[in-house]
């Protein structure tokens, strides 16, 4: 494959480690791409492309650190996280840092440490990005063959894929180790309203874990989004981490099979399109996970899910009217169905009224009141605890509804509050980003397939607007 270096389009001669800041490799003459095409100019300059990626990582990590410290500086311990517009601290709290029983924040110092560590890391990445973008070798193949590559080199590409898979597997195991050995993680299902605990009894049964993948995505099934205990979540990360690491080793040691060499397009833009497609799928799955799952995304930090807020309202008024003497087991609503309680299509006792459509909700404040046939009437009469009442009243008034002007709550509610749930933000942003990543996947896949067939899709190079503009240099 070493012969491929001479086939590069727009390849130019360079002196290794040339200390100049010349604009070679960045203008249209030497790369075939105009300045606004961004990193396309660096397709065949592995050293410069490394600089762009490292600098980009630095920007990402800088944002994480700065935003983290910003949230710490504005944090008010007396209010729940989801009332304060926080999007990073809920993730740290979910990992068990700084919180105690009921999700109460008892120490903000770990959050401060996290922000500082990210800021320091971003400085290192930023320096590396600037070094490789401006001073380092333009191509890595000659001086550092291990880090060099040619996009057409199928064996090298699958080796790089393998390295990425191993890193992803290590990331999955970091969560496992945090949950098992380093202080545990927050469990919203811990008795009495949630607490941080170490996971001791991992679920490793493939029939249970892979059974989630075979579930229907609808209703009470809910595919993988229906997972509701941490043992399954952490056990799933053991499996995923192992599969990623073993798959990574396999991809490093093997060469692509003949069918894969024939079926796939082997170019930089093709790999970009594959990556965008995968990220798009991740975004859509994350959207559903954030919106519906209150185990991986505890309501104490992210606010209640939509179904949870609705069921909490039914529960709150059941408690109130029961105290006022209503017989909640037999009271009829305006439609002739039960006002407080009714039966689901499969016979369980569920909350009546409009919230009947959310009857498959599972939430830690409600489950203790269920029996073998749904909600247990005797428990509803005798066993409701003050913490359940407080939590449901809180969730009832913090439904994940809201608009861009930050007036949250039901649109017809005149006493709306200045609140938008982080659950809304996370779900919406991941859906929107997933959609745009999918469009990017289609665009780059089309261009890559066209290039492989010998022509080019996109803006006509002979008439693109940039040709009539003054060159940057």
Curated annotation (Swiss-Prot):
Keywords: Acetylation, Chlorophyll, Chloroplast, Chromophore, Manganese, Membrane, Metal-binding, Phosphoprotein, Photosynthesis, Photosystem II, Plastid, Thylakoid, Transmembrane, Transmembrane helix. It is a multi-pass membrane protein. Residues 1-14 form a propeptide. The modification Phosphothreonine is found at residue 15. GO terms for molecular function: chlorophyll binding; electron transporter, transferring electrons within the cyclic electron transport pathway of photosynthesis activity; metal ion binding. Binds multiple chlorophylls and provides some of the ligands for the Ca-4Mn-5O cluster of the oxygen-evolving complex. It may also provide a ligand for a Cl- that is required for oxygen evolution. PSII binds additional chlorophylls, carotenoids and specific lipids. [CaMn4O5] cluster binds at residue 367. The modification N-acetylthreonine is found at residue 15. Pfam families: PSII. It is found in: Plastid, Chloroplast thylakoid membrane. HAMAP family: PSII_PsbC_CP43. One of the components of the core complex of photosystem II (PSII). It binds chlorophyll and helps catalyze the primary light-induced photochemical processes of PSII. PSII is a light-driven water:plastoquinone oxidoreductase, using light energy to abstract electrons from H(2)O, generating O(2) and a proton gradient subsequently used for ATP formation. Belongs to the PsbB/PsbC family. PsbC subfamily. This is Photosystem II CP43 reaction center protein. It comes from Phaseolus vulgaris (Kidney bean). The gene is psbC.
